[in-house]
Amino acid sequence: MPRTLFHDIDPARLRARLKEVTDAAAGRAEILVACKYVPLEEMGALAAAGVTLVGENRQQDLAAKHERWGDAFEWDFIGNLQSRKVKQVLPLVRLIHSVATDSVLAQLEKHAGPDTEVLIEVNVSGEEGKGGVEPAELPAFIERCPVRVGGLMTMPPFSDDPEHSRPYFARLAELAASNKLRRLSMGTSQDWPVAAEEGATIIRLGHALFV
């Protein structure tokens, strides 16, 4: 995956690529454009391409981009969320995709409004050192969450073979169903078609749209 910013984004090309993805997903999933590597001055190209939903990984970048382009998009927070950043992130976003710690729950209790909705990040793969709630602990974590839990999110182990992600996506869908949750944020540039097949309702795309 690249670690350089995307410049000279062609709105027409991006619009065409978005249509390809939307058609392939049969309209079942929202396409969230991850803008971590989209500089502030290129956000207008996303708007011109018809992008409606964007996701940011860092609170500082979210604040800067939202200040200039706040009315152009719906905004989600998709990065690792530090508890001390919750207060700043909440007013700017529709959803937080990465709630996974009790320290974040404590900040949500202090600062969230009545319409706040979050997704719980689940460590479906059981990887050590990886963020996310363990599946066995999920019901209790949902019970402790002081705001509305709309669904779940996961990041499977990285693989060049999209099929390697399938069992993790299928497991997340099972967990969502058993906990009566509607939203499934899963699938990124390397494995989104598999995620769509397994029931994703939000697909997070960056690199696949811009190169």
Question: What are the roles of these predicted feature ranges?
Answer:
Residues 1-190, 196-198, 210:
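Conserved alpha/beta-domain cores
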Residues 201-202:
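Divalent-metal-activated hydrolytic enzyme cores
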